[in-house]
Each structure stands twice: as C-alpha cells, then as structure tokens.
Amino acid sequence: MATNDLSRLPFRCLARLVPTMLLLAAPAAWLQAQPADWAEPFPGHRVIGNLYAVGTAGLGVFLITSDDGHILINTGLEDSTPLIRENIESVGYQLEDVRILLTMQAHWDHTAALAEIKEIAGAEMWATEGDARVLEDGGFSDPHFGGRVSFEPVEVDRIINDGEIIELGDVRLRVHEHPGHTEGSSSYSMQVAEGGRDYNVVVANMGTINEGKRLVVDPTYPGVAEDFARTYASQKAMDIDVWVAAHGGQYGLHDKYEPGQAYSPDTFVDPEGFLAEVERLEAIYEEQVAEERQ
C-alpha cells in the first residue's frame, strides 16, 4: 500500500485477526436470499475492443486486456473464481496474467473472490479511499450491510482517485468516483477504436439505493444524499457510446446479447439507454428524499 495509506493499518490488522468461523458464519438471511442468476454461468464474450464480460448471468465482471497484462473489474460470489477463470480462457486469455484488480463497489456480490484471485494471479488490488477500508475488513465496516464479515478481506495495494488515469501497457482507463451506493463506488471509462470509429466506453456503477437505506438521516454514512446527487449529475454529463454495469439487468445484457452471437462493436452501443437509466434512478432517489423529509 502507498505510504499515505498507513493510517488504515489497524483495519488491515483487524481483518487478519478475524476468526475464520466468523467469516463462515457470514451468510445471514440477506446473503442467502440472493438472486439465482448471480451464480448462474454465462459465456464470456467480447463487449467491444479489448473489453470482455467474464462474469455470470447476473453479475458483471469485466476483463480489460493490454499488451502488458490485464485489468479485472469485480469478481462474483466467493465460489466464482473457477467460472471467471473459464470465461477468461474462453475469450483467449489467462487469469494468471491479470495485473490489476478493481471493483465498482465494495459489496460481497462483487468482491467475494478478490482475495483468492489476487493470490492466484499475484495481482495488485487498487481501490478508492471510500471502499478500501471495507475491502480490507471484509465488509465489516460497510455502512449498510456491515457489522459482520461478508467476504474474505483483501489487502489494498494502491488508492485511486477521481480523474486518475490507470495505465497498463496500452490501456488508459479513467477513474470516476460515483459514490452513494457505497462510499467509494466508482466507474471506469476509456476510448476504444473500432472500424475507423472511436467509441467512448464506460464500466458504470449505477446509483441504485439498497432497500432500507436512508438518505436524509443516515449517521453511518454522512452525506450519502449529496453523494448520490453528485453521482447522477456526473453520469448525466458523461459522453457515452457503450456501457456495461455491475449487474447484467442494469444494462440490458440479455436483451442486447445472446450466447454465441457474432461479435459487433455496436452490440452494446446505447447512449440513450444509459441516460434513461440514470434519470430513472435519480427519480427514485428524489422521491425517497422527499418522503424522508416529510
């Protein structure tokens, strides 16, 4: 971890001391009642250029390839490593060549296999300041789902910030901090050249509000309402051609792509759909804020 991150050392130590039995006991009712498609295999496929979807039918896991190793964004549930490996190999690459691990949000459904893949690949875990602590204590400090360890803690090697450009080989990936869903939620964007055209591509963390989360009075996460508002404004201002998200249902995966479908760079072109989804989520947010203020 970078020298300016030593202030979080106690959380790393805490994570290492968490009893294994506590981790095994983590699947409480809210963990067990997960959608079936989160664990349902789905073929790996090319989204556009050097961006591949290698997750499940319901969970977005994305591989960005370069000439000097690869970036993996998200994992799935704790037993998802074999599936992710198989999907990566099916599109012509190797899990062991992953150099950087990223996540869009520090919730167990996107982080539970990070520690295992980090060890297998020898990759570095990069994360925003807002999510790093949650990653390192296995979800214990999460403002909404916390109070228990919900995934294997993963050590963060580097803090990334809004606007930063992640460079790996020929990849230039921009970090967009889009907090609200978690304090450190983030999206990632890059430009892809295909067929003489440049496409603006974003791996977007959408501003969804978990059931039971309060926005106006939420002492475990001060400023969450303002964070959501900034995220919606930021996303509406983005120039996007192609987008994917943390859940297949959020970006219409199964409407846009069928297994075995021939590759086209235009399959996931959907700027109107992105804006419509952001505006839909913003309307839900505004309605909840108004209700809480009554």
PLM ranges: what are they?
Residues 2-19:
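Bacterial N-terminal signal peptides that target proteins for export
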Residues 37-91, 95, 187-209:
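Conserved beta-strand hairpin/beta-sheet module of binuclear metal-dependent hydrolase folds
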